[in-house]
Amino acid sequence: MKDRIKEYLKEKGRVTVNDLAQALGKDGSKDFRELIKTLSLMERKHQIRFEEDGSLTLDQKKKHEITLKGTFHAHKNGFGFVSLEGEEDDLFVGKNDVNYAIDGDTVEVVIKKVADRNKGTAAEAKIIDILEHSLTTVVGQIVLDEEKPKYAGYIRSKNQKISQPIYVKKPAIQLDGTEVLKVFIDKYPSKKHDFFVASVLDVVGHSTDAGIDVLEVLESMDIVSEFPEAVLKEAESVPDAPSEKDMEGRLDLRDEITFTIDGADAKDLDDAVHIKPLKNGNIELGVHIADVSYYVTEGSALDKEALNRATSVYVTDRVVPMLPERLSNGICSLNPQVDRLTQSAIMEINKQGRVVNYTITQTVIKTSFRMTYSDVNDILAGDEEKRQDYKKIVPSIELMAKLHETLESMRIKRGALSFDTNEAKILVDKKGKPVDIVLRHRGVAERMIESFMLIANETVAEHFSKLDLPFIYRIHEEPKAEKVQKFIDYASSFGLRIYGTASEISQEALQDIMRAVEGEPYADVLSMMLLRSMQQARYSEHNHGHYDLAADYYTHFTSPIRRYPDLLVHRMIRDYGRSKEVAEHFEQVIPEIATQSSNRERRAIEAEREVEAMKKAEYMEEFVGEEYDAVVSSIVKFGLFVELPNTVEGLIHITNLPEFYHFNERDLTLRGEKSGITFRVGQQIRIRVERADKMTGEIDFSFIPSEFDVIEKGLKGSGRKDRGRRSDKKEDKRKAGHSSDKRKHSSKDKKKKSKKPFYKEVAKKGAKHGKGRGKGRRAK
């Protein structure tokens, strides 16, 4: 019907709906309703448009108009950017040119103004068509509203990039205003109505429920904890233990001294190791991974759901697993003293850390001990009580530590980069309220297991690459020269000597930079800046190596319980072992799986960051008014981001500084025009917590003059345009909290109320100034 409508409009130009219905023979009541639905859909896709008099026309572009297709990234203040595939620079879209596009929409644009590299201005574009809406569901608390009696009320969403209200149709159930709802978008904002219209899909919970804030974030990203009934039914059919038949044809390693090393609270123990010295002076290392693919067969309900999720999601107070607990905490968990099916990479490693021989095969193991990182670290530190308790495996642990040193040294020599940035764990009570933020400590045990997982992943990837079979790789491409240049410029401002240009700088040169700043107050910040200059690792059917690890071959083999690519690798190991004829099948499915897994990983990271920001802001609400020593973590044109020792980061907006400040983009500094006070990344300063907003995840600080301040006289030539200025508006006063010896509270009874922050002011989409919590080991 759509083609007939288009042909008719093309011929007639402008027609009424009734004329169109008669021409198409759709003027009967049932056919007319079908026509109206089709027209509504075509209007949403910008294929037709309704004129002010109600008539219809084709929504055509101007002749000879060059258009581009891209993804729109909205800013909460109304403007946005459009990213084009394969292009480094984004197009700026002004508030009046957004044309009702929503963050994430696929859009068509025309160029209004070309970029001016001399002035440093971006190209400007206008959105002329929305090709596909990204937002189909929204989660938030219902606000009952009688202003529009046709609707039950509107949704209060955490998504700050949605500027228009979302009105909800009256559902069959009675609402009291405490419900957190998941709604489906029926109508998007347009010239006719500047708001969304949505229908209730589900009641996620109530505002008084414990942990509802985290659940709201997860549900808004379609990260769902509950598994479909068919998936749970399949999981229940999996036995509690492998049978003798299951073990047929497997290498039996149950007599090897094998054990797991994990965090104390880990339940899904999916990797175990064994080690022994060989007569020729080399070391045999066995990395044994739960054979999840034996139970999750291709095409099953379990497999389809695992691919849909593609990864487990780890947030502050919960895990949303890729697989049901029946598997992950049951038969696929390598618990001590029980038989378990595994896939193993058994490697002979020489004194230089090179794998000189290996076997990749299906095995059966029985772990001797369930070790924790703290236990292993204590043993290596000489704890006699622990060494006595685990005397059977102390020699193995000591040999593992020795091998780890060899492997780590090997990676460093070949150019692997190490980003040792602080990571924090947010501790919450039973109601989900944050009670403390503690730094994570990575000891020898944690780094040792990471070394073993890395070498196993490399060995498996190299094996299949050399067989020239279709395979899935974990790739990390070289960083863009533009981003590396910014890092070089900044590192040079500390007096560091840089060897090589941005397009040619070696990994060894980057290593030298990081070694040169070890122990300096700005070392962590510089490490984070280097990390931000890197591209994001992803999955691909093509092997492009792993820049961060300086590895020619890399994949993910070691965590099939929580990552789908690892599950696929296990499946390929088994299937290729039987016949190479399955190559054509894998060649077809791998690209889609790689894309899905990369996208789901990015979604998981976004969820983790959003929850972390929310919980950190909630934690800091109690400390508004307190003063702390902090470190400048990032400087931008509109202010400076400052990090506390517990990794909490906040913004000091330039309008809240006491004078004009010049921004030097090359050196990333802000310098006071009169006082000469200069802020640099890595510099220690004194701050006061002014505002913490759980809803937005934003934290505002103010600058307190102190003995840390650096004064640099003789300011040269920054233009007036880069200067910050005091706000001319009078600011409200409010009482500070009571003083506390422990918290070093300000002695003042009154303090300024901070202005609402303007984060990412005219910044490109995707710029991140806060630290995201990494997965730690096994996440590269």
Q: Which residue ranges define each predicted feature?
A:
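Electropositive polyanion-binding surfaces
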Residues: 22-25, 160-164, 169-173, 182, ...
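Acidic/polar residues at beta-strand termini and the immediately following turn/coil
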Residues: 51, 84, 157, 350, ...
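Intrinsically disordered, low-complexity linker and terminal regions at domain boundaries
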Residues: 105, 125, 653-699, 711-717
